[in-house]
């Protein structure tokens, strides 16, 4: 029951679904997700924590940087089935298509330029 509730919580917010689906093309740094969604770092970070707890997303840390990817291979079977369902159900969603266009631009940028949110003053 707990796993089900975590997954449904992860999928119950439009911003989390947008963040989740931004990972369709592969691993992203938190700052790339922030730039794509155009939300504050703390907001995106909290959403990514929920997705990780749900088992929908894997996280790795490299220095101050946090990288995320879909938990396709390592996730629990229920999380993997949920991911497949979301990908299929929302494949033609206009907001997600707009996010994909933004993300293509973000991916073309130098990662150091995008990760400016990690630089300390």
Regions found by a protein language model. Name each.
Residues 2-43, 65-75:
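N-terminal helix-turn-helix DNA-binding core of bacterial DNA-binding proteins
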Residues 9, 18-21, 52, 58, ...:
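A cross-family signal for key residues in well-ordered alpha-helices
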Residues 35, 52-53:
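Alpha-helical residues within the helix-turn-helix
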Residues 48-49:
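Short, hydrophobic-biased segments on the C-terminal half of alpha helices
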Residues 53-62, 69-71:
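Beta-hairpin "wing" of winged helix-turn-helix
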């Amino acid at each position: 029951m707990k796993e089900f509730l975590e997954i449904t919580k992860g999928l119950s917010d439009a911003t989390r679904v947008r963040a989740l689906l931004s990972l369709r093309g592969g691993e992203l740094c938190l700052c790339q997700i922030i730039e794509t969604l155009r939300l504050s770092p703390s907001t995106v970070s909290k959403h990514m924590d929920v997705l990780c707890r749900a088992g929908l997303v894997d996280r790795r840390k490299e220095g101050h940087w946090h990288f995320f990817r879909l938990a396709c291979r390592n996730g629990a079977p229920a999380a993997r089935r949920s991911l497949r369902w979301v990908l299929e159900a929302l494949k033609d969603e206009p907001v997600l298509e707009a996010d994909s266009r933004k993300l293509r631009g973000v991916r073309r940028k130098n990662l150091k330029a995008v990760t400016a949110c990690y630089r300390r003053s």
